[in-house]
């Protein structure tokens, strides 16, 4: 006999602890949940009267009969018609109330102890001579449960375990049932390092002694049956031939296998050895399945066989039936069909019922229109001839897509071979685009056009290049490299011509006529084009923050006459995703590695677009020295700029040699070598306010390239800026960059100062160089060139909160000569007088309001 440890009684069917249950259990009571349907009251009375809930409908009918006989007592407590009420109460879908509880108390001669949430019970005495009571738990949802003492539940758990063990051990004859229950429900209580076992003469394990006092008796193969469907897969039972049930199972399986072999046409001489699922001959199949992590029977069955765990079998069965009915959407004991229901119809003079679909039902439910699948037409049948579908013929609908993510995923097959392994880099392996991409599906574009801007520029250039391709082919001798690339270049050439879009303005393509001997004009390589209209024949100057802004350092002028842009503004967006700042000159300190894309040399021999050199021996490089020298020099210059050093041969091209900062240097030498279109990044003018968009003449500051500084080293800047001298002059405040700008949220009481950047010769790491240029700052003044209109007076079209530019703070003193032709060491009066401005457009109107609060 098995010896087990003492444990407190627990509930095996409750999924989560209920606070009401915990309150009752702390006081020695146990709440047994009943099915949450309309018959909960009658289930409680049937269980407490007859120890089963299966008689709940009979209890309902007895209650209705008793209330009908005692009509004079219960009629006054029922609102409305008493007969209609009794007729509805006889139906299973009508909820019972306190009136029915009183009637059944009088019927069965018992008083009631009514429990409510957080209440120890209220005794309702109908007659003092009644010796027993109904213990009912009631909540506000019109639901009733049974309440028992904990001692009663302990005895019920023992009886339940005995009943299930008799079923599985004596009827099914499964081996080692008690041991399997302990392993499944209490695996943490086993200490396999300390235990004793006993063996018989044949080597079978017959008993296990645990250190905590538990003793488990193990079964022998002759007294049990195999848990597997085919006992031949279990060496524990297949070696014993005295099993009648297993022999019958094996005989049926053997006959079935022989029939399958005959049907398939095999000779029947195949080896009959099957891979055993339980290979150990001295260990039972149940223990071997447990060792493999397989449950020999459901956990609910194991809970029912545990004497210290009570399982609410009635509630579990009802819950399973409810889930099954909800899953398969079947009518269970209900003939209340709806339109669209799939059911069976009983036709006259037919021996079997046919599957049909309800199309229409009359209001009185006397007849209905159904579509019969067998005959393929719609007929009218009586409503009583409809019957629910049997469970084996019902096929549920497909689950919605939102439930698919909860279903198990199908495992993807693993690719065999070396493709599944992590590939290692080899230097002798080079990337060939032809091996991975098709030419017809791979188009390499230098930029991404938005709204087809400047379309005529590239279309005309392609057309001119197409006309000149045959002549270039005649002039250039054939080489091995051109012979290899000629077929691919022709395919690319044909595809480019086929996918070419016709220009919208055909007259623009006829303005230029190119002769056969003349070289085609270079393509205009541009990264950004401001969204402002420009006059014909003039390309808008780039802002200093753009990659084309360092004109002093990289003087690559665009050769040829630029093509006129369209009248409306347009943009070429680069692949980097950095949008252009608003038009206007924005300061940027020091040289940076961003540079414009220069035009290639015109005397390059070859066909089609240039390609990358991939061969290790360099056989795919151009044969002409001009192209090699051009790109080699470009790489050397890029290397110097990436390391943030100045190339030795370009020192004379700079407009300055030191950082232009008067706050840190007492004196400097200014080298004037810039023109009108090439402004340095340090001495550029901040963007103007939109209020001056209607001005007709630019400020003199825009026409001057350099501004000399005040070399007064005695001046000390305080916390707040000093009062400006000669405030009526428009040149001084317009170029006064370190002047703090008032914040719009502080009403002019707070100002933003700009910090001094690091010198240009400071070494910066390459990752920092690849960052995009900083956004433009916010300047709140009214002097400057014409700007876009459309903004309100006193507002700025740019968003507040943008970071300040990295500039060198400096001042331009009044009467300082801004003319580029002047000498850098001399101060001369200004030769160009500014145009008279209105009072509202003068800088004094901007700074006076915030400085004199």
Curated annotation (Swiss-Prot):
Residues 29-150 form the OTU domain. Residues 769-778 have a biased composition (Pro residues). Keywords: Amyloid, Cytoplasm, Hydrolase, Ubl conjugation pathway. Its main location: cytoplasm. Residues 1-20, 460-531, 681-704, 732-794, 817-853 are annotated as: Disordered. The N-terminal 423 amino acids, which includes the OTU deubiquitinase domain and the tudor domain, is essential for germ cell proliferation and early germ cell differentiation up to stage 10 of oogenesis. Gene3D superfamilies: 3.90.70.80. It comes from the Eukaryota. Expressed at high levels in the ovary, at low levels in the brain and fat body, and at moderate levels in the gut. Residues 747-758 have a biased composition (Polar residues). One of its GO terms (molecular function) is mRNA binding. Changing residue 37 to A: Loss of deubiquitinase activity. Residues 336-396 form the Tudor domain. Residues 460-470 have a biased composition (Basic and acidic residues). Self aggregates, forming amyloid-like fibrillar helical structures; protein aggregation is mediated by the C-terminal LC domain, is enhanced by RNA binding and is essential for deubiquitinase activity. Interacts (via OTU domain) with bam (via C-terminus); the interaction enhances otu aggregation and deubiquitinase activity. Together with bam interacts with CycA/cyclin-A; the interaction stabilizes CycA by promoting its deubiquitination. Together with bam interacts with Traf6. Interacts with Hrb27C; the interaction is RNA-independent. One of its GO terms (biological process) is germarium-derived oocyte differentiation. Induction: Expression is cooperatively activated by Ovo and Stil. Residues 396-853 are annotated as: LC domain. Catalytic component of a deubiquitinase complex consisting of bam and otu. The complex deubiquitinates K63-linked polyubiquitinated proteins; this antagonizes the ubiquitination activity of Traf6 and regulates the IMD immune signaling pathway. Otu-bam deubiquitinase activity is regulated by Traf6 dependent immune signaling regulation of bam expression levels; this forms a feedback loop that regulates the IMD immune signaling pathway and balances gut immune activity during aging. The complex deubiquitinates and stabilizes CycA/cyclin-A to regulate CycA-dependent differentiation. GO terms for cellular component: cell cortex; cytoplasmic ribonucleoprotein granule; cytosol; perinuclear region of cytoplasm. This is Deubiquitinase otu. InterPro entries: OTU_dom, OTU_OTU, OTU_Tudor, Papain-like_cys_pep_sf, Peptidase_C85-like, Tudor.
């Amino acid at each position: 006999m098995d010896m087990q440890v003492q444990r407190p009684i627990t509930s095996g069917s409750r999924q989560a602890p209920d606070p009401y249950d915990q309150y009752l259990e702390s006081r020695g009571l146990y709440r047994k949940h009943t099915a949450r349907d309309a018959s909960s009251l009658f289930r409680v009375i049937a269980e407490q009267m007859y120890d089963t809930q299966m008689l709940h409908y009979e209890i309902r009918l007895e209650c209705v009969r008793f209330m009908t006989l005692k009509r004079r007592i219960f009629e006054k407590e029922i609102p409305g018609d008493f007969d209609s009420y009794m007729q509805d109460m006889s139906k299973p879908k009508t909820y019972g109330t306190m009136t029915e509880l009183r009637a059944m108390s009088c019927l069965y001669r018992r008083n009631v102890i009514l429990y409510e949430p957080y209440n120890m019970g209220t005794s309702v005495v109908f007659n003092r001579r009644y010796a027993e009571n109904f213990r009912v738990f009631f909540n506000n949802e019109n639901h009733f449960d049974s309440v028992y003492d904990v001692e009663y539940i302990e005895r019920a758990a023992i009886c339940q375990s005995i009943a299930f063990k008799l079923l599985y051990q004596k009827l099914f004859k499964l081996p080692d049932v008690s041991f399997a229950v302990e392993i499944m429900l209490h695996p943490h209580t086993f200490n396999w390092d300390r235990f004793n076992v006993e063996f018989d003469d044949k080597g079978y394990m017959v008993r296990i002694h645990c250190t905590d006092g538990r003793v488990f008796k193990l079964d022998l193969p002759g007294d049990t049956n195999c848990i597997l469907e085919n006992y031949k897969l279990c060496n524990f039972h297949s070696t014993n031939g005295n099993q009648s049930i297993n022999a019958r199972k094996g005989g049926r399986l053997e006959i079935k296998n022989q029939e399958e072999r005959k049907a398939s046409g095999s000779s029947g001489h195949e080896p009959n050895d099957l891979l055993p699922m339980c290979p150990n001959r001295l260990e039972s199949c149940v223990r071997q399945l447990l060792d493999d992590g397989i449950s020999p029977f459901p956990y609910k069955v194991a809970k029912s066989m545990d004497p210290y765990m009570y399982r609410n079998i009635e509630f579990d069965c009802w819950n399973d039936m409810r889930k099954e009915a909800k899953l398969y959407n079947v009518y269970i004991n209900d003939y209340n069909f709806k339109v669209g229901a799939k059911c069976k119809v009983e036709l006259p003079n037919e021996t079997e019922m046919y599957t049909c679909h309800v199309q229409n039902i009359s209001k009185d439910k006397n007849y209905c229109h159904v579509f019969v699948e067998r005959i393929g037409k719609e007929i009218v049948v009586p409503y009583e001839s409809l019957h629910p579908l049997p469970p084996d013929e019902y096929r549920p609908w497909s689950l919605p897509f939102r439930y698919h993510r909860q279903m198990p995923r199908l495992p993807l097959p693993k690719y065999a071979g070396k493709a599944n392994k992590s590939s290692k880099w080899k230097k002798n392996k080079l990337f060939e685009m032809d091996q991975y991409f098709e030419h017809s599906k791979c188009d390499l574009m230098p930029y991404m056009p938005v709204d087809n801007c400047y379309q005529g520029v590239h279309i005309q250039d392609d057309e001119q290049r197409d006309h000149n391709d045959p002549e270039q082919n005649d002039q250039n001798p054939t080489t091995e490299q051109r012979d290899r690339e000629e077929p691919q270049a022709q395919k690319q050439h044909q595809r480019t011509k086929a996918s070419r879009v016709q220009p919208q303005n055909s007259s623009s393509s006829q303005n230029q006529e190119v002769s056969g001997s003349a070289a085609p004009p270079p393509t205009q390589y541009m990264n950004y084009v401001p969204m402002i209209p420009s006059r014909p024949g003039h390309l808008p100057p780039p802002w200093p923050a753009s990659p084309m802004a360092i004109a002093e350092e990289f003087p690559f002028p665009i050769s040829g006459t630029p093509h006129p842009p369209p009248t409306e503004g347009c943009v070429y967006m680069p692949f980097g995703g950095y949008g252009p700042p608003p038009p206007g000159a924005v300061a940027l300190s020091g040289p940076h590695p961003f540079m414009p894309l220069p035009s290639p040399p015109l005397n390059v021999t070859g066909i089609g677009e240039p390609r990358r050199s991939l061969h290790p021996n360099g056989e795919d490089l151009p044969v002409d020295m001009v192209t090699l020298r051009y790109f080699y020099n470009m790489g050397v210059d890029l290397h110097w700029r990436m390391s943030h050093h100045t190339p030795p041969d370009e020192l004379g091209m700079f407009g300055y040699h030191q950082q232009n900062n008067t706050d840190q240097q007492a004196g400097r030498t200014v080298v004037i070598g810039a023109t009108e279109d090439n402004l340095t990044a340090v001495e550029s003018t901040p963007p103007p306010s939109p209020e001056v968009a209607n001005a007709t003449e630019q400020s003199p500051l825009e026409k001057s390239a350099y501004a000399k500084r005040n070399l007064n080293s005695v001046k000390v800047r305080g916390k707040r800026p000093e009062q400006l001298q000669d405030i009526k002059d428009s040149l001084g405040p317009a170029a006064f960059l370190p002047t703090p700008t008032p914040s719009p949220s502080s009403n002019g009481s707070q100002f933003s100062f700009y910090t001094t950047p690091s010198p240009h010769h400071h070494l910066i790491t390459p990752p920092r160089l690849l960052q995009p240029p900083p956004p433009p700052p916010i300047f709140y003044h009214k002097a400057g060139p014409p700007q876009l209109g459309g903004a309100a007076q006193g507002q700025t079209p740019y968003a507040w909160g943008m970071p300040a530019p990295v500039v060198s703070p400096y001042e331009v003193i009044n009467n300082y000569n801004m003319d580029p032709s002047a000498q850098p060491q001399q101060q001369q009066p200004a030769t160009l007088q500014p145009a008279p401005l209105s009072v509202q457009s003068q800088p004094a109107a901007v700074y006076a309001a915030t400085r004199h609060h």
